[in-house]
Amino acid sequence: LTFNKFTGSRGKSGSNDANAEYLAQLRRVMDEADVAYQFAELGKVDLGGGGTIAYIMANYGMEVIDSGVAVLNMHAPYEISSKADVYEAVKGYKAFLLYA
């Protein structure tokens, strides 16, 4: 399961950034559920494009973070992901809904 604590483009325009306390709670839940996870970045955020709805939810005062299954070559003719990553994502989402 991959977490991305910051999303946005052109600096802080349309962005969100998960705070340290929320990340600590999330890490505790994942560790207690024995979920394999990692933190990642989107890459060159100044190029724009893509994006998620996390910043919209953050505008309502929600604690937000983007998460998903790691994908190699996203939006290319051949995308690759692992069954183990999908399994860990299911475990992680279940743990989040039960304990976070």
Predicted regions and their residues:
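His/Asp/Glu-rich mid-to-C-terminal helical/loop segments that flank catalytic regions of hydrolases
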Residues: 69-100
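Active-site-adjacent substrate-binding region
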Residues: 1-78
